[in-house]
UniProtKB/Swiss-Prot annotation:
Name of the featured protein: 2-isopropylmalate synthase
Reactions catalysed: 3-methyl-2-oxobutanoate + acetyl-CoA + H2O = (2S)-2-isopropylmalate + CoA + H(+)
Organism lineage string: Bacteria, Pseudomonadati, Pseudomonadota, Betaproteobacteria, Neisseriales
Main location as per UniProt: cytoplasm
Binding residues annotated for Mn(2+), in chain numbering: 16, 204, 206, 240
UniProt domain Pyruvate carboxyltransferase: residue ranges: 7-269
Quaternary organization: Homodimer.
Organism: Neisseria meningitidis serogroup C / serotype 2a (strain ATCC 700532 / DSM 15464 / FAM18)
EC primary class: transferase
Molecular function GO labels: 2-isopropylmalate synthase activity; acetyl-CoA C-acetyltransferase activity; manganese ion binding
GO biological process: L-leucine biosynthetic process
Length: 517
């Protein structure tokens, strides 16, 4: 592998991915995701937007203190205050980057920035010079680049390269481009930019037309050597380019691209499951690479072919991306050491003995209810327990549901708010409605339920149900998750989890105009 054919994987799940409605994560959840991304082998972890809020600063700083192999990066507007906060946040990281940006399209410069092109160049150069005071690794992004005039882009990119930028990122901020245009754009821009051969060129594509991955691959054909992407394609609006799809496209079609990454592809599925569970965004079954049906064959002809020779209908193996062939994990007789070892095999790290003991206690409870415990059960169980430990405001204790044909169901629920036990009862049009009404009779959150969904964690009637609840209040949207073999218990846990996150998000206001690329 040479530098010329090595693709840098820049993961922005913790920054751009978190901008999905309701996907906000706590500091502890971000650290868990960052650790998994490091195991996955991503080169750059964009840990957040340090200047957006004190909570964001703390999360970026905590990740910078935790990660040792990947580069830790913070996004920053081309504003001195933002850049200095980013520099301070990533300071503890052995490898650090500041990623600063400013809009360059005519419509953004005129209506959003209200700046002339010359002023934009001056601001960009100043930003890069300040960032270089903190690190030699500085990335500059031209927001809305694919709708910018290419001659102006070449001018501003040349100026920031001279000022010390080492990576130039060209975002398709609104997902407007199409692949052949993207490839042409990169080829022309790299040639036109003064000293364009001295930096790494990067693509950051959004999925508004469903072309984020295709455009990212086209950018690589056009000369880019970094792609910015997220696990499961998570991101605002239609999402971002999916890291798993880009990586596997480069691996499976190495004959066409001749490019390499440093990704451990067997960590793709564990990464997908962790991000899905923490954010409350389920992976669609037919999602490429990580969907539950990605390696399923229903056609008899296909099944026969796969049994005779897998490559007849499979262009990659399920094992190569982290799907286990034997997912049966543990049983009721399994001990604490076996449990701990299995979690490590799954890439799950618990921060303390207290957390391990709590998760093991939950495992034993589950083992009494469910004869066979699979990897997916452990992911759901640990995420549910960690959420319970970290979200201190609202905690589930117990509940009783009474239903009879022709009568309204009744929910009697016991939960705690900041350690104080509460009891509530309510009837509803169904048991779920009764649970939510009972909780709200005490919580009085004023939130609106946007989404309620239940997914079976594994196959079979004994499966755990993983429940997601999305609540909205004002301009705040949060997702809550719960898991249990009793889906009504999982439902109550998910609602209480969402209430805790709603309170958490209210306590960490974002900076005005923090922006995105």
């Amino acid at each position: 592998m040479t530098q010329a054919n090595r693709v840098i994987i820049f993961d922005t799940t913790l920054r751009d991915g978190e901008q999905s409605p309701g996907a906000a994560m706590t500091k502890e959840e971000k650290i868990r995701v960052a650790r998994q991304l490091e195991k996955l082998g991503v080169d750059i972890i964009e840990a957040g937007f340090a200047a957006a809020s004190p909570g964001d600063f703390e999360a970026v700083n905590a990740i910078a203190k935790t990660i040792t192999k990947s580069t830790v990066c913070s996004l920053s507007r081309a504003i001195e205050r933002d850049i200095r906060q980013a520099g301070e946040a990533v300071a503890p990281a052995p490898k650090k980057r500041i990623h600063t940006f400013i809009a360059t399209s005519p419509i953004h410069m005129e209506y959003k920035l209200k700046m002339k092109p010359k002023q934009v160049i001056e601001a960009a150069v100043k930003a890069v010079k300040i960032a270089r005071e903190y690190t030699d690794d500085v990335e500059f992004s031209c927001e809305d680049a694919l709708r910018s005039e290419i001659d102006f882009l070449a001018e501003i990119c040349g100026a920031v390269i001279e000022a010390g930028a080492t990576t130039i990122n060209i975002p398709d901020t609104v997902g407007y481009s199409i692949p052949y245009k993207t490839e042409e754009f990169f080829r022309e821009l790299i040639v036109k930019t003064p000293n364009g051969g001295k930096v790494v060129w990067s693509a950051h594509c959004h999925n508004d037309l469903g072309l984020a991955v295709a455009n990212s691959l086209a950018a690589l054909k056009g000369g880019a050597r970094q792609v910015e992407c997220t696990v499961n394609g998570l991101g605002e609006r239609a999402g971002n380019a999916s890291v798993e799809e880009i990586v596997m496209a480069l691996k499976v079609r190495h004959d066409l691209f001749g490019l390499e990454t440093g990704i451990d592809t067997t960590q793709i599925v564990p990464s997908s499951k962790l991000v899905s569970t923490i954010t409350g965004y389920p992976v669609q079954p037919n999602k490429a690479i990580v969907g539950a049906n990605a390696f399923s064959h229903e056609s008899g002809i296909h099944q026969d072919g796969v049994l005779k020779h897998r490559e007849t209908y499979e262009i990659m193996s399920a094992e190569s991306v982290g799907w286990a062939t034997n997912r049966l994990s543990l049983g009721k007789l399994s001990g604490r050491n076996a449990f701990k070892t299995k979690l490590a095999d799954l890439g799950i790290e618990l921060e303390s003995e207290e957390a391990l003991n709590a998760a093991f206690a939950r495992f034993k409870e589950l083992a009494d209810k469910k004869r066979e415990i699979f990897d997916e059960d452990l992911h759901a169980l640990v995420s549910d327990e960690m959420g319970s430990m970290n979200a201190e405001s609202y905690k589930f204790i117990s509940q009783k549901i009474s239903t009879e044909t022709g009568e309204e169901p009744r929910a009697d629920i016991v939960f705690s708010i900041k350690g104080e036990e509460k009891r509530a009862s309510a009837t509803g049009s169904g048991p779920v409605d009764a649970i939510f009404k009972a909780i709200e009779s005490v919580a009085q959150s004023g939130a609106t339920l946007q989404i309620y969904s239940v997914n079976a964690v594994t196959q079979g009637t004994e499966s755990q149900g993983e429940t997601s609840v999305r609540l909205a209040r004002g301009n705040r949207v949060v997702n809550g998750q719960g898991a249990d073999t009793d889906v009504l218990v999982a439902t109550a846990k998910a609602y209480l989890s969402a209430l805790s996150k709603l309170e958490f998000s209210a306590a960490k206001p974002k900076a005005q105009g923090s922006g995105t690329i």
